[in-house]
Amino acid sequence: NNLEKLIFPVGNEYGDHNDPLHLNDIQPVLNDSKFWKRGDIFMSLKQISLVLLYRPSTNKIIWHKQGPWVYQHDVDVINDHQIAVFDNNRDDFLKSEVKDSNEILVYDFEKDEIFSPYQIGFVKNEIKTPSQGLSEILSNGDVFIEETDYGRILRMDKNGKIKWQYINRAKNLKIYRTSWSRFLEENLYYSIVEKIANVNCE
């Protein structure tokens, strides 16, 4: 796909040559649209701040974008023309720290535009995990967030109001990481419960 130059950039003496890509998330495409086909896979390559769309049936990368996200995690398909990317927004040039906050960047394939619908809430609530992290935009517009390194999961509305949050604090008062948290909306939850109830394991 003529993207070899991204693996070991010229002059990158500080990069991790043992892990030049660091694939940290894949998101299978479940439905056809004008921009992708069922069976395609979105991939997040953290080390080079790249998100790509791979088509296994042809072994081709059919779309890719490097930045504006930095050291991103967790790509989600929102609808038939938009994806969401959890942007860690980490500055590793001078200090290894998050600039201002994390954010969710939405890329619109139809308009070739990127916007940040929850930025006010991310800044207000100081959501800034340096590594990992995930998010899911819910059907009513709220967003579920895992702030992995600080052991916090929360639900936040479009205006940045936290509806609830959980901090993974143990009896010794230390806070431990959360990892791969999931939020199930009601319709999906009851669908799973129904399927489990109808399973015959004999």
Language model feature labels by segment:
Residues 1-202:
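Histidine-/acidic-rich catalytic cores in large beta-rich domains
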